[in-house]
């Protein structure tokens, strides 16, 4: 029986907020966002869950881009179906632009900043008998800051511990387990990306003990939630096109911000999601202006994990999971070259939001296998389900996204 050779993709993300008051001199990103895939992927996940969700579309996309890089071919100008499909879905038509984009973002994330912690890291955990092709190693390291570590999948307990320890280290201990020994059965390569963010609100909320009020979930029955409140000048818009209010809360450091999309009382989260696409969201964010806003938000803290194979197939990424997968630049060695496919993509994420700020984290894993085997004071009262996302505003990159159906803190 042939050994199954898996490539696993794992993602992890973490977000934490704290704050000391500081002037917000940095407004929303005004350029063209590259978020078509992000929104399509997020909407696919959201529609399958009637509960709280948090995930990192960025973490998924960077690993899929690394798989895209491996789908290149040395046979003249031929383009494999694997590469064509990935390019179409994740919008990698210009690979030089894509590489420059990731390199710029990752180098920016590595800069020391006293106002926030942002850590993005990618690692290949490769079986001893697999040799990753030098050209691919150079591409992965130079443009995506990806590192490589040799492990022995014949000892899955030790390898799982190695991977989990790496994830824990890069998320400040918030994520302790992304793989288990059983989940590594047949694996030859595991690609892991982690993203960790701990930020301070530019304008922290006053801490008030036991500020408990009703939260009206989709089922109509109110539950109690702990709220935080403040008045201040914030970027805000009530979008008629989306049928929702949009609020921006910046973090210290003039780099990142959190956006909240609150459906109007006569709309639901799903109805707003149906109206959101790259163009409509860009327009809604463009129309945001500084207003005096009375902000009421629930505090929340939760983790979320999801197998991503099915959602990704629903948005058009199918070939990497099939017997027809073509990843010739990834590796060579016994049972590797032209004989690997992606078996599993998995993400685990978490988020904490309170008066001081937020903490969020996510890890994504990909496993490859042998393929043979306004006017006046605005009121923003988030006492009903809403959507949120955290953006790196230097490039308009959506790092985290989620929805709240029942705030638990």
UniProtKB/Swiss-Prot annotation:
Location relative to the cell: Secreted
Organism superkingdom: Eukaryota
Pfam families cross-referenced by the UniProt entry: Serpin (PF00079)
Gene Ontology terms: cellular component: extracellular space
Keywords: Glycoprotein, Immunity, Innate immunity, Protease inhibitor, Secreted, Serine protease inhibitor, Signal
Modification after translation (UniProt): Protease CLIPB9 binds to SRPN2 via the hinge region resulting in the cleavage of the reactive bond. This leads to a conformational change in SRPN2 which traps CLIPB9 and distorts its active site, resulting in CLIPB9 inactivation.
Site-annotated residues for Reactive bond: 371-372
GO biological process, one term: innate immune response
Annotated glycan sites: 294, 324
Purpose: Serine protease inhibitor that functions in the melanization-mediated immune response. By preventing the activation of phenoloxidases through the inhibiting of serine proteases CLIPB9, CLIPB10 and CLIPB4, negatively regulates melanization in the hemolymph. By preventing melanization, has a detrimental role during P.berghei parasite mediated-infection and invasion of the mosquito midgut.
Oligomer status and interactors: Forms a covalent heterodimer with protease CLIPB9; the interaction inhibits CLIPB9 protease activity. Forms a covalent heterodimer with protease CLIPB10; the interaction inhibits CLIPB10 catalytic activity. Interacts with CLIPB4 in the hemolymph of immune-challenged female mosquitoes; the interaction results in CLIPB4 inhibition.
Similarity-based family: Belongs to the serpin family.
Protein name: Serine protease inhibitor 2
Source organism (scientific name): Anopheles gambiae (African malaria mosquito)
Lineage: Eukaryota, Metazoa, Ecdysozoa, Arthropoda, Hexapoda
């Amino acid at each position: 029986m042939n050994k199954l050779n898996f490539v696993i993709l794992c993602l992890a993300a973490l977000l934490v907020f704290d704050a000391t008051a500081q002037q917000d001199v940095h407004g929303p990103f005004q350029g063209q966002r590259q978020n078509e895939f992000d929104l399509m992927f997020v909407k696919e996940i959201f529609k399958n869950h009637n509960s709280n969700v948090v995930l990192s579309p960025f973490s998924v996309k960077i690993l899929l881009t690394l798989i895209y890089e491996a789908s290149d071919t040395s046979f003249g100008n031929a383009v494999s179906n694997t590469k064509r499909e990935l390019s179409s879905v994740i919008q990698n038509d210009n690979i030089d632009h894509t590489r420059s984009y990731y390199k710029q973002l990752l180098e920016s994330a590595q800069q020391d900043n006293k106002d926030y912690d942002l850590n993005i890291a990618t690692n290949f955990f490769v079986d001893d008998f697999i040799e990753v092709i030098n050209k691919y190693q150079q591409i992965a390291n130079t443009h995506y800051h990806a590192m490589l570590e040799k492990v022995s999948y014949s000892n899955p307990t030790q390898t799982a511990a190695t991977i989990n320890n790496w994830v824990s280290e890069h998320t400040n201990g918030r994520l302790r387990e992304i793989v288990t020994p059983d989940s590594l059965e047949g694996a030859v390569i595991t690609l892991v990306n982690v993203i960790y963010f701990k930020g301070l609100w530019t304008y922290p909320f006053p801490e008030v003990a036991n500020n408990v009020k009703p939260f009206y979930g989709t089922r109509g029955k109110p539950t109690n939630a702990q709220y935080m409140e403040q008045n201040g000048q914030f970027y805000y818009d009530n979008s008629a096109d989306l049928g929702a209010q949009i609020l921006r809360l910046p973090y210290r450091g003039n780099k990142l911000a959190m956006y909240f999309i609150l459906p109007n009382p006569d709309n639901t989260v799903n109805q707003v999601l149906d109206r959101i696409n790259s163009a409509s969201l860009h327009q809604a964010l463009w129309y945001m202006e500084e207003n005096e806003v009375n902000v009421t938000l629930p505090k929340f803290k939760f983790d979320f994990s999801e197998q991503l194979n099915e959602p990704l197939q629903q948005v058009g990424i199918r070939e990497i999971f099939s017997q027809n997968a073509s990843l010739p630049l990834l590796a060579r060695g016994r049972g590797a070259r032209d004989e690997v496919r992606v078996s599993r993509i998995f993400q685990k994420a978490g988020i904490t939001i309170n008066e001081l700020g937020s903490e969020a984290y996510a890890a994504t894993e990909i496993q490859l296998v042998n393929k043979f085997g306004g006017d006046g004071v605005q009121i923003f009262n988030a006492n009903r389900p809403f959507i949120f996302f955290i953006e790196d505003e230097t490039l308009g990159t959506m790092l985290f996204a989620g929805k709240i159906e029942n705030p638990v803190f």
